[in-house]
């Protein structure tokens, strides 16, 4: 800390500050003086900060310094609580806060000067988005941004030129070299002219060469124009694709949507736009006009000092107290009449505030949605340029994902069924093979037994008869089964219809009960909601009344406190006057002449006598001046006449000297006569 203070003191003692501090005087600086030192250091970095803080409010001083420190990117150590401590310390001029700031500023003064200079031109003026809807404002803002970019480019070039080390001597040397080269080129041109003039048809050759140069320039211009048209065509194709995608998305949205939903959405948009145009925007415009009027009024008025501001604050407090008293009188007078209306008014004000808040939220959401759509379109264009494929939009992507999920589940189920069927097929195939082998063995055994008994072919004939009888029985059974199935199906249908009727009867009865219960619950919900709204409005009104009462009591407390301070000041003044009167009485009663001379009465008596003597002398002087005024005026007139006479003689003498003599001047007895 001591090294920090020493560095600050040494830097302040040097140019351009020249404070002549030592450790004792610097450490004994008061908070106001320390803030003035900080303001002087900031003024060295930014000349706009050259302010006498005694003529500035503390809040304005802190705001000005904090804004400049923010531009200079000063970061005090600590968290949010330390930041609040830093702001408070900057307001009151705390040394633990001011010393690190001074040390940081004085360490990098030149760098911060450059940063403050650039901040004047590179801090962008934020324009509200609703103002940018105006074409004039948008064009001006665009021009402003272009000028800012041009300034950045020029500043970079300036810095590069400073780093490159070009000097005026080198530039002059280059200029002289270019002039010499120009002279050489002129000589070469003259030499070539002389050589060409000797050739035949040199004028025609020069004309052809000139035409060739013009055509080459025209060819370059056409190539450049061709490239520009290619770029325009590319941008137009991109724009066409973007518009086609928008049209496709709109058609899909229109195809997916119903007319009722579209009409409902359009009605909501119309209501919202109507509210914005008829209520919100006129209010904001009126508020902005009032604010502009007040600001113009403030700008037109002369600058006010601290005393004027205190006087205005006292007037504002008096007017506020009068307004509160009038409101209280009005409330007391109109309480029985407007008791019921106040509740509805407060409810209406609460609803209007909620409506405005929701409108602002909706406007912000729309702006955010528009920005996200612009960003998404940019990303889609980048993706299309990268791999040439279309990017699915939100709804399309959701449908694609859902379709893919459903197909995936179906695929998994089918795959599982196929695996089960494969396993079952393998098992059945093995069973079939075993049964075939067993059947073949049994057939071989049967044939051998028939051959042994001498009745070969009997089993085959028996099998054929059984097969034919089985087929006949199957056909008969199928016919009977068909009739039975038809009659059974009719019975089932009748029974199913009766069951559904009975089941639906209970369901319909239950549905009626549920509908009735729903209506009762809806009615109860509406009643509870109205009770809640009225209770909330009543609580809101009570809260507003309590806030007004608290505000009024605080104002009364402030008034009583100011009245208390005023009374104390008056008491002190009266005590001083009483002390003076007591001292005067003591001096007047005292027998000491020296004490009597100190009395104010004696001093006033003495001053009165002196003034009377002075008035008497002045009256005598006035009398003398009045008596001598007439002769003096006469004497002054005689002197003026004498002066005119001498001037006339002078003119005559000069005329006599300059012209030829046309007469004779005779002097006799102190008189001059001119004889022509």
Swiss-Prot record:
Listed GO biological process terms: cilium assembly; intraciliary anterograde transport; intraciliary transport; intraciliary transport involved in cilium assembly; regulation of smoothened signaling pathway; sperm flagellum assembly; spermatogenesis
Keyword Glycoprotein annotated: no
Residue positions where Phosphothreonine is found in the record: 61
Modified residues (N-acetylserine): 2
Function according to Swiss-Prot or TrEMBL: Component of the intraflagellar transport (IFT) complex B: together with IFT74, forms a tubulin-binding module that specifically mediates transport of tubulin within the cilium. Binds tubulin via its CH (calponin-homology)-like region. Required for ciliogenesis. Required for proper regulation of SHH signaling. Plays an important role during spermatogenesis by modulating the assembly and elongation of the sperm flagella.
Clinical condition linked: Short-rib thoracic dysplasia 19 with or without polydactyly: A form of short-rib thoracic dysplasia, a group of autosomal recessive ciliopathies that are characterized by a constricted thoracic cage, short ribs, shortened tubular bones, and a 'trident' appearance of the acetabular roof. Polydactyly is variably present. Non-skeletal involvement can include cleft lip/palate as well as anomalies of major organs such as the brain, eye, heart, kidneys, liver, pancreas, intestines, and genitalia.
Quaternary context: Component of the IFT complex B, at least composed of IFT20, IFT22, IFT25, IFT27, IFT46, IFT52, TRAF3IP1/IFT54, IFT57, IFT74, IFT80, IFT81, and IFT88. Interacts with IFT74; the interaction is direct: within the IFT complex B, IFT74 and IFT81 mediate the transport of tubulin within the cilium. Interacts with tubulin; the interaction is direct. Interacts with IFT57 and IFT70B. Interacts with RABL2/RABL2A; binding is equal in the presence of GTP or GDP. Interacts with IFT88. Interacts (via the IFT74/IFT81 heterodimer) with RABL2B. Interacts with CFAP61.
Record protein name field: Intraflagellar transport protein 81 homolog
Organism: Homo sapiens
